Amino acid sequence: VTPHQKYVFSPDDFNHTSEQTKAFVKRNLKYLLDTYHIDGFRFDFTKGFTQKQTTGDDDLAATDPARVSVLKEYYEAVKAVKEDAMVTMEHFCANEETTLATEGIHFWRNMNHSYCQSAMGWKDNSDFSGLYDTTRPNQFVGYMESHDEERCAYKQIEYGNGALKTNLSER
């Protein structure tokens, strides 16, 4: 059962607190590291690695010790196979991010708007300070585009400032 219907478009969902699920995920992580020699993983929507029933973003982002435990366990499984592998999570639960960052986990930080503003040549809102948070470990990986955020080049051509809009060599 999916405990957070808002974000999952199928009734099927892994129960990450199940020992069988954890063994399955860890076995697959090991296989990918050993077979393909990849340098790490980015986990999408780790906020959803919970079995708590939630009704909204605040509930879903609330601290969930079981979720933290599962994510640490997956991180440790990766590090046991390849010590220098990078683990990045799209999490969006501030308190848990602080806890998990002290373990060494990195977090996906949406900087799409800032990147687009900068690429278009607009100083307003092209601030990248969201990548730096002095109140917790600096474990952010800022991204310009992803499967959720896109169209930076399109915006540059459509809304760019001066020559950035029309002259490819200026971009």
Q: Locations of the language-model features?
A:
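A structural motif
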Residues: H37-I38
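Alpha-helical packing segments of well-folded alpha/beta enzyme cores
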Residues: T21, V25-L32, V70, Y74, ...
